[in-house]
């Protein structure tokens, strides 16, 4: 798959405001500061498409990006960010849960896991939630450029242990683009097979 066009559509804080569910949605989920925005920019080749920040908690809404005029990339707020109020954390959690439970257009959930700190409690909870709701998902091990080959192989094995039902596990580096072609191939397959 080649991405030839990508544009920001809108940010949403309510399920009722989301676009009509007519195009497939590829959803990106993960802990705060795991690299979701960097991955989206890397996949599309557009550095400023998704706003990045070294400060966790930058994404606070559900962000929609129209890709090739055919499907959406959906950037969810990061989970596990401790520096927000309990009420804000609960609101984000409810928004994410409702979206994943109810949104018919979801083709695939791409769960980003920091390869340097793989499968923390929040990551495992997300995978269990997706499995409970029968959502197809794949795992992207981010920041893999910071690992040597032995550590990358270990991450792959750990991922398969925690997520036996994952459609794929990809080591990815937004810095070098390693894993990009493989991830785009998996995304393409999920859209075609929907």
From Swiss-Prot:
**Superkingdom of this entry's organism?**
Bacteria
The organism's taxonomy opens as: Bacteria, Pseudomonadati, Chlorobiota, Chlorobiia, Chlorobiales
Q: In its keyword annotation, does this UniProt entry include S-adenosyl-L-methionine?
A: no
* Record protein name field: Probable GTP-binding protein EngB
**Which Gene Ontology CC terms are recorded?**
cytosol
Summarize where Mg(2+) binds, as residue positions: 37, 59
| UniProt record similarity statement | Belongs to the TRAFAC class TrmE-Era-EngA-EngB-Septin-like GTPase superfamily. EngB GTPase family.
Q: Which UniProt keywords apply?
A: Cell cycle, Cell division, GTP-binding, Magnesium, Metal-binding, Nucleotide-binding, Septation
Q: Which GO terms describe its molecular function?
A: GTP binding; metal ion binding
By its UniProt entry, which Pfam families does this protein fall under?
A: MMR_HSR1
UniProt keyword Nucleotide-binding present: yes
Q: Which PANTHER family match?
A: ENGB-TYPE G DOMAIN-CONTAINING PROTEIN, MSS1/TRME-RELATED GTP-BINDING PROTEIN
UniProt: GTP binding residues: 30-37, 57-61, 75-78, 142-145, 172-174
Cofactor(s) demanded: Mg(2+)
Q: Where is the EngB-type G domain?
A: 22-193
Query: Which species?
Result: Chlorobium chlorochromatii (strain CaD3)
Q: Name one GO biological process term.
A: division septum assembly
What this chain does, per the record?
Answer: Necessary for normal cell division and for the maintenance of normal septation.
């Amino acid at each position: 798959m080649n991405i030839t066009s990508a544009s920001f559509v809108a940010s949403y804080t309510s399920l009722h405001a989301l676009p009509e569910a007519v195009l497939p949605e590829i959803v990106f989920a993960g802990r705060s500061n795991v690299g979701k925005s960097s991955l989206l920019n890397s996949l599309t080749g557009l550095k400023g498409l998704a706003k990045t920040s070294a400060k966790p908690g930058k994404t606070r809404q559900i962000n929609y990006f129209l890709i090739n005029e055919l499907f959406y990339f959906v950037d969810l707020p990061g989970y596990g960010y401790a520096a927000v109020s309990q009420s804000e954390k609960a609101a984000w959690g409810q928004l994410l849960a409702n979206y994943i439970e109810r949104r018919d257009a979801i083709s695939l959930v791409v769960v980003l896991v920091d390869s340097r700190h793989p499968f923390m409690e929040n990551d495992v909870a997300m995978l269990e939630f997706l499995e409970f709701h029968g959502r197809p998902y794949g795992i992207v091990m981010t920041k893999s450029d910071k690992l040597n080959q032995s550590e990358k192989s270990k991450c792959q094995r750990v991922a398969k242990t925690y997520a036996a039902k994952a459609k794929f596990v990809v080591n990815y580096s937004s810095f070098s683009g390693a894993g990009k072609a493989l991830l785009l191939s998996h995304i393409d397959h999920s859209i075609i097979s929907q």
